[in-house]
Amino acid sequence: MRLPIFLDTDPGIDDAVAIAAAIFAPELDLQLMTTVAGNVSVEKTTRNALQLLHFWNAEIPLAQGAAVPLVRAPRDAASVHGESGMAGYDFVEHNRKPLGIPAFLAIRDALMRAPEPVTLVAIGPLTNIALLLSQCPECKPYIRRLVIMGGSAGRGNCTPNAEFNIAADPEAAACVFRSGIEIVMCGLDVTNQAILTPDYLSTLPQLNRTGKMLHALFSHYRSGSMQSGLRMHDLCAIAWLVRPDLFTLKPCFVAVETQGEFTSGTTVVDIDGCLGKPANVQVALDLNVKGFQQWVAEVLALVP
């Protein structure tokens, strides 16, 4: 039985790998994609997502989502992904268009039509998910769980303590973490370990057309290097769905700091239970790196 999932994303180079795995991993049934502003503007993330769907000839509906965070000015990660979000490869022209409704309403409608609860996967800022939960609370029973790439129990990657996807819209993340839905958090504690080695990266052009495309994108990706290895942050959320045995999780109380001058966007992960609050998130703290790398190679070999 394939697991039905909806994917909320902000492509983004590592998003492209996660999208490939979500489409082609035989255990998963990707039924809806939505885009959000994050790595680059929502117009660019939508264009990039449509380009990828066309590249793989995937007939998956896509809805464009939030262009700005809930309450603050937008920030991006163009320094990591390039100004377009997916520089380095010339995709062919197409005439695909997003659905005519906002992402959170597309998610709501698809949830309400689904014959069983659906797993949501969010690998960008949580703006669309927060809008869904705040504007359409009747949808909560139809959400099996939410798996996110975001946050950290330790160091950050855009401030000393904050990870980009959470820091891009802390108010949205705080709303989601308070919502009461089941959450699995794949943060920097595991994603910084999720490295594709230079030896493997060098084989991609010979793998298939997707390997050639990803190799071209990776030459513009700044989360590591082709010489030292590249971090596949977003792919961890998809990997957990298929291979949860590769991850070590701990139930923790997690809150999001929205006010601090130096700490805004920090996920406060109470690993030791100091606050005495009930756990609201399953936090991934460790990764079987060799197993992850083997799984990635197996999945990408399935992609045409």
UniProtKB/Swiss-Prot annotation:
What EC identifiers does the entry list? 3.2.-.-
Question: Which Gene Ontology cellular component terms are annotated?
Answer: cytosol
| Single GO molecular function | purine nucleosidase activity
The Gene Ontology biological process annotation of the record reads: purine nucleobase metabolic process; purine nucleoside catabolic process; pyrimidine nucleobase metabolic process
| Keyword set, alphabetical order | Glycosidase, Hydrolase
Which InterPro entries does this one have? I/U_nuclsd_hydro_CS, Inosine/uridine_hydrolase_dom, IUNH, Nucleosid_hydro_RihC_nonspecif, Ribo_hydro-like
Domain of life (superkingdom): Bacteria
What is the active site of this protein?
H233
Family assignment from sequence similarity: Belongs to the IUNH family. RihC subfamily.
The job of this chain, per UniProt, is described as:
Hydrolyzes both purine and pyrimidine ribonucleosides with a broad-substrate specificity.
Query: Which PANTHER family does the annotation name?
Result: INOSINE-URIDINE PREFERRING NUCLEOSIDE HYDROLASE, NON-SPECIFIC RIBONUCLEOSIDE HYDROLASE RIHC
Q: Under what name is this protein listed?
A: Non-specific ribonucleoside hydrolase RihC
The organism named in the record is Escherichia coli O157:H7
Q: Which gene encodes it?
A: rihC
